[in-house]
């Protein structure tokens, strides 16, 4: 397994009341089962559902924004990405992000650190939002997008390309308000399949055509949001990559079943048509 981290089992806490409108509360899956749903195994199999759906799927969380320093190998990989040919796409900030970066650095235990130093001090990729607008980002290992192209965009616009994401976009105002409230802590997880073995799935790194299942990887992201105060919020992403052949038969069957229920639009958005054909779904 190529892994930044294991998704933390037991990181969630029961879903008590959030002070948000009920329509948004329903989208947050406030019932207790949502907690179990996102406390995933080391390869994130609890994220895989049949049928596949696109939603907000936020759960209250006790997970840390960062599990701490990366390994030396991972830090070197991040540094190489930030200073490589695609670096300008991966790390940047708006001119008004200074106060938020100060709060984020203090929250992570690195007061005074700049954005790159913060990113290199954490296992996770990092982002900073103010009232739901992206103000800074340091994503060494993005999933199919150019991170700095999203700077200055609000939550709904950032997620505009997401196929079948109407519920997510409609809830964007409530999500932005909730993540900015004092003490707010949320988590969610997402998964996909890829033929690109690198942690970075930047669109400048084209995915190889896949001809055998052994060339596939199951990729998961564990995402955490913490309110930082003054309407700022920190956002982190930990990535896990597991080779298809290292999954159990039951896990491969579940992934295939979920993929079989994805809409054509979602398959296109995730670049999964060729993989679906290989899996005969």
What function would you assign to each model-found segment?
Residues 4-16, 20-281:
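Extended, well-ordered protein cores
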């Amino acid at each position: 397994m190529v892994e930044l981290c294991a998704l933390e089992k037991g990181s969630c806490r029961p879903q008590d009341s959030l002070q948000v409108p009920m329509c948004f509360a329903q989208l947050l899956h406030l019932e207790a089962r949502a907690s179990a749903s996102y406390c995933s195994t080391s390869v994130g199999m609890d994220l895989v559902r049949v049928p596949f759906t696109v939603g907000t799927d936020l759960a209250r969380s006790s997970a840390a924004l960062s599990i701490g320093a990366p390994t030396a190998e991972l830090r070197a990989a991040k540094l190489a990405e930030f200073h490589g040919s695609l670096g300008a796409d991966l790390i940047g900030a708006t001119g008004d992000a200074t106060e938020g970066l100060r709060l984020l650095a203090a929250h992570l235990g690195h007061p005074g650190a700049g954005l790159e130093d913060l990113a290199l001090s954490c296992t996770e990729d990092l982002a900073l939002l103010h009232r739901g607008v992206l103000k800074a980002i340091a994503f060494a290992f993005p999933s199919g997008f150019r991170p700095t192209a999203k700077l200055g965009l609000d939550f709904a616009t950032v997620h505009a390309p997401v196929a079948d994401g109407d519920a997510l976009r409609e809830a964007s105002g409530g999500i932005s308000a909730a993540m900015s409230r004092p003490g707010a802590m949320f988590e969610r997880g997402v998964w996909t399949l890829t033929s690109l073995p690198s942690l970075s799935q930047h669109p400048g790194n084209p995915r190889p055509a896949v001809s055998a299942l052994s060339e596939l990887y199951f990729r998961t992201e564990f995402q955490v949001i913490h309110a930082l105060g003054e309407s700022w919020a920190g956002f982190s992403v930990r990535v896990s990559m597991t080779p298809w052949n290292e999954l159990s038969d039951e896990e491969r069957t579940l992934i295939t079943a979920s993929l079989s229920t994805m809409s054509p639009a979602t398959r296109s958005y995730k670049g999964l048509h060729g993989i679906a054909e290989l899996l005969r779904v």
